[in-house]
């Protein structure tokens, strides 16, 4: 009975990058029940038709919210956040929190320049350029879009080492140009240590994870909770994930059960 009274959080992404957001929320609020759902069948979202994306996310999230009586939804994906949040908020009766690149706090810290490391879809999206226009404080912003960094994060969670020489080559356009870098994809905090190693200790790395965690706490009105036991952690995928056994080893270290398959899509949305 006590377990059923816990607040339930759903973290959603197209891949496992949203686990970086889960970790921040869990660090602040360890006594909640956590559900993680990733739509790997349609990964990566940046290449998906917008209408298909809206339909998929709404169906998957709405089904899991209803089935598990979720109290708050976190869309831990920049692409989905910019495209799907309005319809999700219309369809759901629970709060929905999205992610945006942390341009404003980065610009307040920067003296030399800001680097935005994100996916190609994010760096070319109009919404991102509006964020830069409105919040960059006149600081120069260097844009770097990479899908390979996303793959590196996925591989790291499956026990593979991050190839530092390749990472250095990818990040080279930012070297000696910025003193603050925004990790503008939820995958990238998973390889934060490696990115820091390449860019150097003089570059400050910023992501949205802590801000999202504080927002979740505020929306759930979570004060000092009396509950001392940690909640459950369950993870679902829309299709069998690659290198599933290796992934499950990492997930177990985070307290999750092995990945379960979650199918709640119509034929037209596959």
UniProtKB/Swiss-Prot annotation:
Gene3D superfamilies for the chain: 3.40.50.1860
Biochemical pathway: Cell wall biogenesis; peptidoglycan biosynthesis
Pfam families assigned to the protein according to its UniProt record, in alphabetical order: Asp_Glu_race (PF01177)
UniProt-listed Enzyme Commission number(s): 5.1.1.3
Residues engaged in binding substrate: 13-14, 45-46, 78-79, 186-187
Keyword Iron: no
GO MF annotation, one: glutamate racemase activity
Matching InterPro entries: Asp/Glu/hydantoin_racemase, Asp/Glu_race, Asp/Glu_racemase_AS_1, Glu_race
Gene Ontology biological process: cell wall organization; peptidoglycan biosynthetic process; regulation of cell shape
Active-site residues annotated for this sequence: 77, 185
Keywords assigned by UniProt, alphabetized: Cell shape, Cell wall biogenesis/degradation, Isomerase, Peptidoglycan synthesis
Catalytic activity: L-glutamate = D-glutamate
Main function: Provides the (R)-glutamate required for cell wall biosynthesis.
Family of the protein in this entry: Belongs to the aspartate/glutamate racemases family.
Classification via PANTHER family: GLUTAMATE RACEMASE
NCBIfam families: glut_race
Identification of the protein by name: Glutamate racemase
Protein source organism: Vibrio parahaemolyticus serotype O3:K6 (strain RIMD 2210633)
Organismal lineage: Bacteria, Pseudomonadati, Pseudomonadota, Gammaproteobacteria, Vibrionales
């Amino acid at each position: 009975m006590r377990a059923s009274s816990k607040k339930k959080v759903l973290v959603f992404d197209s891949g496992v990058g949203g686990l970086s957001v889960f970790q921040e929320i869990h660090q602040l609020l360890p006594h909640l029940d956590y559900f993680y759902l990733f739509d790997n069948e349609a990964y990566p979202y940046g290449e998906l038709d917008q209408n298909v994306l809206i339909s998929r996310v709404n169906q998957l999230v709405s089904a899991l919210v209803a089935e598990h009586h979720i109290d708050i939804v976190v869309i831990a994906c920049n692409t989905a956040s910019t495209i799907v949040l309005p319809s999700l908020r219309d369809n759901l009766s629970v709060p929905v929190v999205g992610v945006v690149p942390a341009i404003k706090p980065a610009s307040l810290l920067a003296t030399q320049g800001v680097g935005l490391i994100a996916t190609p879809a994010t760096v070319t999206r109009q919404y991102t350029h509006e964020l830069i226009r409105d919040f960059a404080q006149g600081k120069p912003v260097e844009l770097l879009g990479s899908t390979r960094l996303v793959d590196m994060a996925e591989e790291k969670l499956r026990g593979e080492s991050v190839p530092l020489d390749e990472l250095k080559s990818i990040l080279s356009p930012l070297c000696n140009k910025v003193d603050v870098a925004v990790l503008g994809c939820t995958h990238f905090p998973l390889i934060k240590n490696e990115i820091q190693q390449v860019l150097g200790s003089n570059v400050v790395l910023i992501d949205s994870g802590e801000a999202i965690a504080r927002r979740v706490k505020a929306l759930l009105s979570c004060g000092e909770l009396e509950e001392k036991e940690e909640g459950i952690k369950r993870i679902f995928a829309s299709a069998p994930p690659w290198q599933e056994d290796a992934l499950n080893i990492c997930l177990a270290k985070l307290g999750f059960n092995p990945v379960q398959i979650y199918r709640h899509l119509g034929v037209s949305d596959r």
